[in-house]
Design a protein with these regions (language model features):
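A short acidic, leucine-rich amphipathic alpha-helix
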Residues: 37-41, 56
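Short alpha-helical segments that sit at the start of domains
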Residues: 1-22
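Key DNA-contact positions within bacterial/archaeal DNA-binding proteins
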Residues: 47
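Conserved segment of winged-helix/HTH DNA-binding domains
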Residues: 70-101
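Short capping segments at the starts of secondary-structure elements
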Residues: 19, 30-37
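Beta-hairpin "wing" of winged helix-turn-helix
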Residues: 59-74
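Residues within the DNA-recognition helix of helix-turn-helix
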Residues: 52
Length: 101
């Protein structure tokens, strides 16, 4: 493996190196959700989910799509999805293999 690939792999693991972030990513392997839906599914506070989602979007592992525009009374509502299928495959594969260790 070349140096650039090792750096990319390091950045990937650095990004998922948080228990709640990893829970959110695994949740997103099962479908696309709003932050409120993720918070409900994982029994987490929406602000905590939102903070982690912003981080994951900034790292380009998760994408956010506006489904309801911001108004005077409410923030915009987004649906969150894993950026690509390969990340989903990696997460599912890691989860399956971890029990064999």
């Amino acid at each position: 493996m070349d140096e650039i690939s090792v750096q990319k792999l390091y950045k990937y693991y650095e990004t998922i190196n948080d228990f709640n972030r990893l829970r959110i990513l695994i949740c997103l392997t099962k479908g696309d959700y709003t932050k409120e839906e993720i918070a409900t599914i994982l029994n987490m506070k929406p602000i905590v989910v939102y903070t982690h989602l912003n981080y994951l979007v900034a790292k380009k592992i998760v994408s956010a799509y506006v489904i309801k525009e911001e108004t005077e009374d409410a923030d915009a509502e987004c649906i969150y999805v894993l950026t690509n299928r390969e990340i989903k495959k990696i997460l599912i594969s890691d989860a399956k293999h971890i029990n064999k260790i």
